[in-house]
């Protein structure tokens, strides 16, 4: 049995050839994500996972478990799977059959731990579904016009903002909430292992907390905390009930519920400086003198870098550009400037979780 990747250097060539290949890969950048989206919808990755650790299945074995009678399904699936194997999303090996044909077998590469359900039932597959959602993709077709004429691409495409639209479309509301909930769960699981700043808090408000998955995880680990999940009424109406968590509907730009501490996760990046200052001022006013705001957000490096982590935060910044009113990534210095302008005296960055930094904004500076 041979490895598919043993042959990966056969297509090598001159520097110009490599540059041309890179250009074609960039030009076709949406294809792997759309193929991955289809495989997730077909439940292919979960089928392979259920076969056991290290298992590899042939396209025929996978198709046998799909609700299809399409005679071409195996060939189509093979072509989709080998594309993702070339991106190291899947592993691939080959075996020669008795009739001389070569058959490819596919397994899950390490990155698939994020595209299949984890122990919390969370998966970045929900983010694949959201980012490749037709409504979201349509925003990119208006990016050029937004540069020339101003405005937000999503609003140009849909006639309203990405926060207004879910109220008119229950299906998209579910896709949006699912994406945010799954993403939050994955980040929060790691954050709770690294960040110790929840210790000693009596009451914690998760601002723009969605359906409450994150605050539930915090309260589950710190059961003495009274958790409050704060979000817009149309968001929390679908929120499940959690022990120790109260769902409160409201507008964070008008006021927020009083508590010892506030948690703001990947929310400031959605808004302009003006909106962020208004939100942070509401938090400041609702905190006791010894209170703090815990901000978990992506932090941009001062200059572009080529690491996967840097690419991720710049991709997120581009997503903000296309979909959110004034949304943008910020450097550490820009986050601190917002906090100081509102009146927070202390600013610390105790840790990071995946591509996000945890920042603490203290109302009064610790002595």
Swiss-Prot record:
It is an enzyme of class 2 (transferase). PROSITE patterns: SAM_OMT_II. An heterologous biosynthetic pathway of mescaline is reconstructed in Nicotiana benthamiana plants and yeast cells expressing Lophophora williamsii genes TyDC2, CYP76AD131, OMT1 and OMT11, thus providing a sustainable production of phenylethylamine-derivated natural products. The keyword Kinase does not apply. SUPFAM superfamilies: S-adenosyl-L-methionine-dependent methyltransferases (SSF53335), Winged helix' DNA-binding domain (SSF46785). Coiled coil: none annotated. Pfam families: Dimerisation, Methyltransf_2. Its EC number is 2.1.1.27. It catalyses: tyramine + S-adenosyl-L-methionine = N-methyltyramine + S-adenosyl-L-homocysteine + H(+); N-methyltyramine + S-adenosyl-L-methionine = hordenine + S-adenosyl-L-homocysteine + H(+); dopamine + S-adenosyl-L-methionine = N-methyl-dopamine + S-adenosyl-L-homocysteine + H(+); N-methyl-dopamine + S-adenosyl-L-methionine = N,N-dimethyldopamine + S-adenosyl-L-homocysteine + H(+). PANTHER family: O-METHYLTRANSFERASE (PTHR11746). This is Tyramine N-methyltransferase 1. It comes from Lophophora williamsii (Peyote).
């Amino acid at each position: 049995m041979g490895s598919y990747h043993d042959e990966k250097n056969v297509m090598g060539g001159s520097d110009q050839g490599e540059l041309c290949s890179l250009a074609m890969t960039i030009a076709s950048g949406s294809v792997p994500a759309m193929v991955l989206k289809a495989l997730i919808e077909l439940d292919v990755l979960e089928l392979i996972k259920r076969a056991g650790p290290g298992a590899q299945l042939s396209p025929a074995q996978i198709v046998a478990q799909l609700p299809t009678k399409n005679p071409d399904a195996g060939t189509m699936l093979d072509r989709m799977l080998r594309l993702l194997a070339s991106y190291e999303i899947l592993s691939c090996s080959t075996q020669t059959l008795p009739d001389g044909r070569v058959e490819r077998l596919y397994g899950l590469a390490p990155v698939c731990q994020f595209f299949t359900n984890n122990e919390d039932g969370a998966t970045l597959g929900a983010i694949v579904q959201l980012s490749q959602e037709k409504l979201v993709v349509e925003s990119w077709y208006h990016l050029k016009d937004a540069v020339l004429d101003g405005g937000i691409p999503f609003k140009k495409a849909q006639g309203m903002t990405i926060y207004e639209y879910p109220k008119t479309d229950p299906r998209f509301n579910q896709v949006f909430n699912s994406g945010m909930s799954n993403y939050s769960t994955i980040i929060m699981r790691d954050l709770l292992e690294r960040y110790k700043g929840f210790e000693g808090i009596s009451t914690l408000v998760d601002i723009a907390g969605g359906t409450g998955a994150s605050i539930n995880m915090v309260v589950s680990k710190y059961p003495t905390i009274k958790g409050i999940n704060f979000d817009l009424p149309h968001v929390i109406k679908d929120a499940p009930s959690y022990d120790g968590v109260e769902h409160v509907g409201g507008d964070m730009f008008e006021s927020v519920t009083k508590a010892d501490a506030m948690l703001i996760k990947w929310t400031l990046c959605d808004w302009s400086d003006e909106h962020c200052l208004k939100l942070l001022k509401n938090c400041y006013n609702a905190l006791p003198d010894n209170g703090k705001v815990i901000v978990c957000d992506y932090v941009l490096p001062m200059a572009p870098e080529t690491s996967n982590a840097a690419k991720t935060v710049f991709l997120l910044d581009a997503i903000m550009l296309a979909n959110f009113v004034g949304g943008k990534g910020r450097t550490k210095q820009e986050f601190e400037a917002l906090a100081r302008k509102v009146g927070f005296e202390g600013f610390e960055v105790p840790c990071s979780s995946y591509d996000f930094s945890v920042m603490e904004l203290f109302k009064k500076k610790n002595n």
